[in-house]
Regions:
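A short SAM/SAH-binding and catalytic strip from SAM-dependent methyltransferases
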Residues: 64-77
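A short acidic, Gly/Pro-enriched loop at the edge of an enzyme's catalytic core
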Residues: 54-66
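Core SAM-dependent methyltransferase catalytic element
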Residues: 147-170
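Short "lid" loop at the C-terminus of a central beta-strand within the Rossmann-like core
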Residues: 29, 100-105, 149-151
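Class I SAM-dependent methyltransferase SAM/SAH-binding core
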Residues: 2-55
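A short glycine-rich, Lys/Arg-flanked "PGG" loop and its adjoining helix->strand segment in the class I
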Residues: 79-91
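Conserved beta-strand signature within the Rossmann-like core of class I S-adenosyl-L-methionine
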Residues: 92-100
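Short alpha-helix
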Residues: 124-140
Length: 170
C-alpha cells in the first residue's frame, strides 16, 4: 500500500492483515517524527519513500493499493500527485480516499470560495474548493464507490465539512 500524506500514521491500525508493506509519502519531517511510535508498534513495515506525491521514486505498476486521507487539499500539484499515484498502481489497482472539498450546495460553495485564500494561508496550503471526484476522474481514475456528506456539526462548519469518501480504480 502506498499512503499519500502519511501524517502521524493514524491509519496504521486500520490496515487489514493482508497488507504486507506500507510505503509512506510524507512531506513533513515533524509529522514523520510524530508517527514513530505508531510505526514502531506496527507489525507491518513502513518506509518513507518521498516527500512529494508528484514525484514518486517507484517503478510503474509497482504498488497494489493506494490510500489518501485528508491530504489532497494541501498538495500543491494535486493533478501531478494523482497522475503519479495512477502510474505506480498496478493495472486494476485501487485507491481508497477520504477528503474534504467543494460542496455541491451553491450557498456553501460561495463561502468556500470566499474563505479559500485565508484557509490556504492559515492552514498550510489547505484548499476548500477542490472537487475530489472530478480531480480523480481528470487523472483517469474510475470512481467505483462514493459517499459524500457533511461532517456532523453546526451549519457554520459546512465550508470545512463536506467530505467525499470512497474507492477508485486505475
Amino acid at each position: 500500500v502506498i499512503e499519500i500524506g502519511f501524517g502521524s500514521g493514524s491509519n496504521i491500525g486500520l490496515y487489514p492483515a493482508e497488507v504486507t508493506e506500507i510505503v509512506a509519502v510524507e512531506p513533513s519531517d515533524l509529522a514523520w517524527e510524530l508517527s514513530a511510535s505508531r510505526r514502531s508498534g506496527s507489525t507491518v513495515p513502513v518506509s518513507r519513500v518521498g516527500l512529494d506525491g508528484a514525484r514518486l521514486p517507484l517503478d510503474d505498476a509497482s504498488v497494489d493499493t493506494g490510500l489518501v486521507t485528508f491530504s489532497l487539499c494541501t498538495i500543491p500539484d494535486v493533478a501531478g500527485a494523482l497522475a503519479e499515484l495512477r502510474r505506480v498502481l498496478r493495472p486494476g489497482g485501487t485507491i481508497g480516499f477520504a477528503e474534504h472539498g467543494l460542496s455541491p450546495d451553491p450557498a456553501v460553495a460561495r463561502w468556500q470560495h470566499r474563505l479559500d485564500g485565508l484557509q490556504q494561508r492559515l492552514f498550510g496550503g489547505c484548499h476548500l474548493t477542490r472537487d475530489i471526484p472530478e480531480l480523480l476522474a481528470d487523472q483517469g481514475f474510475q470512481v467505483d464507490l462514493l459517499h459524500q456528506d457533511y461532517l456532523p456539526g453546526p451549519a457554520p462548519s459546512k465550508p470545512w465539512g463536506y467530505v467525499s469518501a470512497g474507492r477508485a480504480s486505475a
